[in-house]
Amino acid sequence: MRFVLPKGRLFKGSLEILKKAGIELKPPETRELIVRNGRYELLLARAFDVPVYVEHGIDVGIAGSDVVEERGSDVLVPLELPFGKCRLSLAMPKESAVSVEEMDGFRIATKYPNLARKFFERNGVEVEVIKLHGSIELAPKIGVADAIVDIVETGNTLRANGLVEVEKIMDVSALLLVNRISQKTKFDEINELVLKIKEVVRDGF
């Protein structure tokens, strides 16, 4: 069975929950991105690429619900996992903060252009969305954007950059992802994994 896990904030929790479910995947000791452990194979990928790998043939993955929603990935999601909790929020400079309804014509910087557009469409507000890949909170500081849509955990990064959270767009947590074909061809193996992870969660992971 092949697993793909995200590098970054979800990696440790992903390894731990799989280990407690009886699947021990050793992280790579070098910069290699594929590790084989007996009958398991572990791939490491950028968080945004995990659902793509699962969609296109990797059996099982773990990714944040933010990434899955942003990509509109065609994967099965049998379980929400009890880690990686945060939120996707709209934030802007403290001194120029306004309500969502007052944001017509604003420029919004984000790694999540699809989720940002849907949010503003739901609110009937026309904005320009600028896609960036990192350091989103810098955009308002240098005049590239009026506001940002980004992941917020503690809010410390926002405060450090003079930003305030205006509105939560969605709660985010880690999700277990399963490839649709693998669910049929490896049903017993995957079903057993899902049941074991459910037990681990029930026991208070």
UniProtKB/Swiss-Prot annotation:
<keyword id="KW-0328">Glycosyltransferase</keyword>
<dbReference type="GO" id="GO:0005524">
    <property type="term" value="F:ATP binding"/>
</dbReference>
<dbReference type="GO" id="GO:0005737">
    <property type="term" value="C:cytoplasm"/>
</dbReference>
<dbReference type="InterPro" id="IPR024893">
    <property type="entry name" value="ATP_PRibTrfase_HisG_short"/>
</dbReference>
<dbReference type="InterPro" id="IPR018198">
    <property type="entry name" value="ATP_PRibTrfase_CS"/>
</dbReference>
<comment type="function">
    <text>Catalyzes the condensation of ATP and 5-phosphoribose 1-diphosphate to form N'-(5'-phosphoribosyl)-ATP (PR-ATP). Has a crucial role in the pathway because the rate of histidine biosynthesis seems to be controlled primarily by regulation of HisG enzymatic activity.</text>
</comment>
<keyword id="KW-0547">Nucleotide-binding</keyword>
<comment type="similarity">
    <text>Belongs to the ATP phosphoribosyltransferase family. Short subfamily.</text>
</comment>
<protein>
    <recommendedName>
        <fullName>ATP phosphoribosyltransferase</fullName>
        <ecNumber>2.4.2.17</ecNumber>
    </recommendedName>
</protein>
<keyword id="KW-0067">ATP-binding</keyword>
<keyword id="KW-0963">Cytoplasm</keyword>
<dbReference type="GO" id="GO:0003879">
    <property type="term" value="F:ATP phosphoribosyltransferase activity"/>
</dbReference>
<comment type="pathway">
    <text>Amino-acid biosynthesis; L-histidine biosynthesis; L-histidine from 5-phospho-alpha-D-ribose 1-diphosphate: step 1/9.</text>
</comment>
<dbReference type="InterPro" id="IPR013820">
    <property type="entry name" value="ATP_PRibTrfase_cat"/>
</dbReference>
<dbReference type="Pfam" id="PF01634">
    <property type="entry name" value="HisG"/>
</dbReference>
<dbReference type="GO" id="GO:0000105">
    <property type="term" value="P:L-histidine biosynthetic process"/>
</dbReference>
<keyword id="KW-0808">Transferase</keyword>
<keyword id="KW-0368">Histidine biosynthesis</keyword>
<keyword id="KW-0028">Amino-acid biosynthesis</keyword>
<dbReference type="InterPro" id="IPR001348">
    <property type="entry name" value="ATP_PRibTrfase_HisG"/>
</dbReference>
